[in-house]
Amino acid sequence: MYAVITTVGLKPDRIDDVREIFRRINPDLVAGQEDWESAVFAADRKNDTITLIARWKSAESYQEFAKSEEYRSAMGEFARYFRGSPSVEINEILVDM
């Protein structure tokens, strides 16, 4: 199991806008991805930063998904609220409690 951890700074006061886009887009976006498990959307309101932690069965599945047109299109909808480029890390989950 892998955690794909995406962190990005947002333009001021846009966390709720991005959260609503995520709620609207993500269910259909990952519906056909059999290796996708779950996601957590978290925010640091003081610093206008969001972190998304997505659980995938394999790192390769996420990497292929991230190349898809559907993924790129979704990221385009979010990008208008970004202050910069997202940071993406793929980490193996060693303990899950």
Name these PLM-found stretches:
Residues 73-77:
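Low-complexity, intrinsically disordered Gly/Pro/Thr-rich segments
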